[in-house]
Amino acid sequence: GFGSSDSSANLNYIDDDLDSYETIWDGSVFKSSDSDHQKVVTALKNICSEDASTDSLAEYMDVDNILRYMAVQTFVVNLDSLTGNMPHNYYLYEKDSELNIIPWDYNLSYGGFQSGSADDVINFPIDTPFSESISLEDRQFFMALLNNETYLAQYHEYLSQLVEYVQNGKLDAVYDRITSQIDNLVKTDPTAFYTYDEYTAAKEMLKETISLRAESIQGQLDGTIPSTWEGQSKDSS
């Protein structure tokens, strides 16, 4: 889905009228029918219902995969996506009436899109993982999971796994291996957008940002750092 002003792209349930979701259908990669569209609307209706239960959510969405998607989105603060003010850069996949999300376009992660300060990126709240200006009611699809205690705990567990990956040295090993492989290519690239010195400074800054992000998420999971925008606005420490 695309477009910051189109409410159907944010995967909210609007009504039963298929035309209300025209932005989604217009972005279809494969040929789809009204029958296919009806399955999507029915799924959104059940997912976004105030009565949605653990079982009903699992019936209409690939809960485990979407929770993993949410954990990564939150960790890397990718706001050029469903979590930002412009709900786009994703693929919606339906199979057997179950919805799934395929991620796309992460080049503006870690605050590259619509983020304020470095502190905002590092401490981006895990339990309201959307741009600060977004009402939680405008992200019903994700809030259905975050409002469910079972799925919230599972989401937190996936975040914890990402934190562990950073803090146990595995990320450093991969990061250093990749940068060593491209260092000379960057240095000798005649079409480079940045100087080699700028690249060197940036790669160290990115590494530090990821480390600080992991530290903040651990604090939010432990309860020592507020995990919502509201909580953080009341606690400037």
Outline where the language-model segments fall.
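C-terminal catalytic region of ATP-dependent kinase domains
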Residues: 93-228
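Active-site-proximal structural scaffolding
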Residues: 33-37, 59, 63-68, 83-86, ...
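Ser/Thr/Gly/Pro-rich low-complexity, disordered linker/stalk segments of secreted
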Residues: 230-237
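Internal "kinase-insert"/substrate-recognition segments embedded within catalytic cores
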Residues: 1-76, 124, 128, 159, ...
